[in-house]
Regions:
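Beta-propeller blade repeat segments, especially FG-GAP/WD-type strand-to-loop junctions
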Residues: 1-2, 43-65, 69, 107-126
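Repeat-based blade/solenoid architectures
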Residues: 1-15, 68-85, 128-149
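Disulfide-stabilized cysteine-rich extracellular repeat microdomains
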Residues: 5, 18, 49-52, 75, ...
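Compositionally biased, low-complexity repeat tracts
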Residues: 5-6, 12, 31-36, 54, ...
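Intrinsic-disorder/low-complexity regions
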Residues: 11, 19-25, 30, 50-56, ...
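Beta-propeller blade termini
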Residues: 11-25, 30-33, 81-98, 141-153
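Terminal helix-to-tail segments of small alpha-helical proteins
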Residues: 32-35, 46, 70, 88, ...
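Short glycine/acidic-enriched loop and turn motifs that connect beta-strands
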Residues: 37-41, 101-105
Length: 153
């Protein structure tokens, strides 16, 4: 379960390279980014793939551990959180982009800082903005990711 088993508000999911997760052959694995749906605090969790032995039939098995958990908005905002990842050229990790499912068009971009062994994501609010006029757009906003380019690219 991405959140406690009793939570029934749904989960918004994205993938991204928020930790520098590589195997012994330098293959990089994407992390799972989960935004809590409506009915709870605006929590985002990041799950990192762990190395695991293959099953007896030779098929791979996958285990994930929680690498991060943070509130994308004030604790009393319980509309749910949409999530995406954004690639940053030249950086080891992606950003996480969040948008509320309801309550306004408040987009936030979280910088993918990592610590120690590059297995934990430490969120730092990089920027935020209103995607639309918040006085007229009172529903939420879906977010998407991709590669951040400069004006000269």
């Amino acid at each position: 379960y991405a959140f406690e088993e009793s939570f029934r508000g749904g989960v918004n999911v994205a993938t991204g390279f928020t930790t520098d997760n590589r195997d012994s052959s330098n293959f990089r694995y994407a992390d799972i980014i989960a935004g809590r749906g409506p009915g709870g605090p605006p929590e985002v969790r990041v799950f990192r793939l762990l190395d695991a032995p293959n099953l007896p039939n030779g098929l791979p098995q996958f285990f994930y551990n929680q690498a991060a958990s943070f509130l994308a908005y004030a604790p009393d905002v319980n509309f749910g959180v949409n999530v995406a990842s954004r690639f940053r050229p030249g950086e080891p990790t992606d950003d996480i982009v969040t948008g509320p499912e309801a309550g306004g068009p408040h987009v936030r971009i979280w910088n993918g800082q990592v610590i120690g062994d590059l297995q934990s994501f430490v969120p730092t609010l990089q920027s935020e903005y209103m995607a639309f006029d918040p006085t007229t757009h009172v529903t939420g906003v879906f977010v998407g990711g991709g590669q951040r380019l400069s004006a000269t690219e």
